[in-house]
């Protein structure tokens, strides 16, 4: 059999195999180079990281100090501003110009006016009550005075009438006793001239109709008893009047 020449496909496959082997070798070399460069870069980066860390730390510390200084300055400035504002508001309050003072003050003044009006109305009512009470007390006092005056007048009138009655009774008793004594004396003096009088001028004995009481007492005793009875009646009559009264 004749020998056939190799086909193009086989040649291409061999060429691809050679190129793949070459590429694998190159890749291995590149990986070794990269690993070496990485180690070198890591060493360099570690040295750079320490320096960068120190540099950044110093920068951060300086920035922090700067910020603290700015904060303290701002705080002091804010304190001064707030203090000046408070002083200004205090001056406005002292001059009665601050709104936070004038608005409540207006409310207080309005409430003061209302309370003054209410107090005036209450005062008027209280004065009316006191005036009415005074008039009632005055009227009651006048009525009490009038009643006491009438009672005193009645009492004095009764006492005076009793005294007058007693005086009248005493006067009558004295008149009777004096008449009796006069009659006695006249009877003793004129007993002798009785017979000498004419019959026309002699007193006739009184005619008594009905029962005739013969007193066994003497005339002086009868007169004393009659006077005692009159005085007893006069003493009993005011007591009876007081018991019958209101």
From Swiss-Prot:
Q: In which tissues is it expressed?
A: Expression levels are higher in term placentas than in early placentas. Low levels of expression observed in normal pregnancies and in molar pregnancies.
Family classification: Belongs to the BRMS1 family.
What does the entry list under GO cellular component?
A: cytoplasm; nucleoplasm; nucleus; Sin3-type complex
Q: Which GO terms describe its molecular function?
A: histone deacetylase binding; NF-kappaB binding
The subunit structure is: Homohexamer (Potential). Interacts with SNX6, HDAC1 and RELA. Interacts with ARID4A. Identified in mSin3A corepressor complexes together with SIN3A, SIN3B, RBBP4, RBBP7, SAP30, SUDS3, ARID4A, HDAC1 and HDAC2. Interacts with SPOP; this recruits the protein to a ubiquitin ligase complex containing SPOP and CUL3.
Question: Which SMART domains does the record match to this protein?
Answer: Sds3 (SM01401)
Reported modifications of this chain: Ubiquitinated by a cullin-RING-based BCR (BTB-CUL3-RBX1) E3 ubiquitin-protein ligase complex containing SPOP, leading to proteasomal degradation.
Supply one GO BP term: negative regulation of cell migration
Using the UniProt entry, state the residues involved in the cross-link Glycyl lysine isopeptide (Lys-Gly) (interchain with G-Cter in SUMO2), renumbered to this chain. Answer: 184, 242
Q: Which residues form a coiled coil?
A: 51-98
Gene name tied to this protein: BRMS1
Compartments reported by the entry:
Nucleus; Cytoplasm
Q: What is this protein called?
A: Breast cancer metastasis-suppressor 1
Entry-linked InterPro entries: Sds3 (IPR013907)
């Amino acid at each position: 059999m004749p020998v056939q020449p190799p086909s193009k496909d086989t040649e291409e496959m061999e060429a691809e195999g050679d190129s793949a082997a070459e590429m694998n070798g190159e890749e291995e070399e590149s990986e070794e180079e990269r690993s070496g460069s990485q180690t070198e870069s890591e060493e360099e980066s570690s040295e750079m990281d320490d320096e960068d860390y120190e540099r950044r730390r110093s920068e951060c510390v300086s920035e922090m100090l700067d910020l603290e200084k700015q904060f303290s300055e701002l705080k002091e400035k804010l304190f001064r501003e707030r203090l000046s504002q408070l002083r200004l508001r205090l001056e406005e309050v002292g001059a009665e110009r601050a709104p936070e003072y004038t608005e409540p003050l207006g409310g207080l003044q309005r409430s003061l006016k209302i309370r003054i009006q209410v107090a005036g109305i209450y005062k008027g009512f209280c004065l009316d009550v006191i005036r009415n009470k005074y008039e009632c007390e005055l009227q009651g006092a006048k009525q009490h005075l009038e009643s006491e005056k009438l009672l005193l007048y009645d009492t004095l009138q009764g006492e005076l009438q009793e005294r007058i009655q007693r005086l009248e009774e005493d006067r009558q008793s004295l008149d009777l006793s004096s008449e009796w004594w006069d009659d006695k004396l006249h009877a003793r003096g004129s007993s002798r001239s009785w017979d000498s009088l004419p019959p026309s001028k002699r007193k006739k004995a009184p005619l008594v109709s009905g029962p005739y009481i013969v007193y066994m007492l003497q005339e002086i005793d009868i007169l004393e008893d009659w006077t005692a009875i009159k005085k007893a009646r006069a003493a009993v009559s005011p007591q009876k009047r007081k018991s019958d009264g209101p």
